[in-house]
């Protein structure tokens, strides 16, 4: 039986009087990709921080494999434009990094040519590859990617999806990927979890390889890598985030 690296059981998180996450349960397994989808303010970043152990849940339980190695790619990296920082120096800022490990990590993500480039001059796609290389330095069992394609053009997104799939196969690691885009997700995702404070729905994504508009935009390669996840919600959320059942019109907390 495949081991479970991280298990969340009925996790809730409350900040003051505001409940950010409610009754979240999920499991992360080696070699599997779980994509979190949801609008801004849905609690995705909070859930990531719970998984990373940065904040404790207000209720529920979190169990992690002892000694679990995690690689994390943050949503945004803010660097002082006046700070002289090459990719090589940036990589060495990670504690315990050996200089000999830097070039192989960059090579793995096809970014070796960026070794001596200033971080501030990198494109969105190049920046994400460098962050990904840095996350790989500790040979992670779990790779957490927070909005990995934000600020990356369509071609760069396709390339990153290819790379994530390749790393999943090579490392056999679990991947937790976060997105706010409710329409486009990785076709190779094993499970999609739609979040809006609670789990709205979850399941395998649908590959839309025969959709003419999608093929016209991305081509057949894009159809293999991207998919539209069809939401089968039995409810919607009002402007205050409350649940409104579609059939009855009643609300839940």
From Swiss-Prot:
Classification via Pfam families: ABC_tran
Annotated PROSITE patterns: ABC_TRANSPORTER_2, ZNUC
Membrane topology: Peripheral membrane protein
Binding site for ATP: 38-45
Cellular component terms (Gene Ontology): plasma membrane
Location of the protein in the cell: Cell inner membrane
Reactions catalysed, as given in the entry: Zn(2+)(out) + ATP(in) + H2O(in) = Zn(2+)(in) + ADP(in) + phosphate(in) + H(+)(in)
InterPro entries attached to this UniProt entry: AAA+_ATPase, ABC_transporter-like_ATP-bd, Metal_Ion_Import_ABC, P-loop_NTPase
Top-level division of the source organism's lineage: Bacteria
Residue stretches making up the ABC transporter domain: 6-227
Annotated EC: 7.2.2.20
Main location: membrane
Gene Ontology BP annotations: response to zinc ion
Gene3D superfamilies linked: P-loop containing nucleotide triphosphate hydrolases
Keywords: ATP-binding, Cell inner membrane, Cell membrane, Ion transport, Membrane, Nucleotide-binding, Translocase, Transport, Zinc, Zinc transport
Keyword set includes Ion transport: yes
Gene Ontology MF, one: ATP hydrolysis activity
Similarity section: Belongs to the ABC transporter superfamily. Zinc importer (TC 3.A.1.15.5) family.
Biological function: Part of the ABC transporter complex ZnuABC involved in zinc import. Responsible for energy coupling to the transport system.
Subunit record text: The complex is composed of two ATP-binding proteins (ZnuC), two transmembrane proteins (ZnuB) and a solute-binding protein (ZnuA).
NCBIfam families with a match to the protein in the record: PRK09544.1
UniProt protein name: Zinc import ATP-binding protein ZnuC
Species of provenance: Yersinia pseudotuberculosis serotype I (strain IP32953)
The organism's taxonomic lineage, starting at the top: Bacteria, Pseudomonadati, Pseudomonadota, Gammaproteobacteria, Enterobacterales
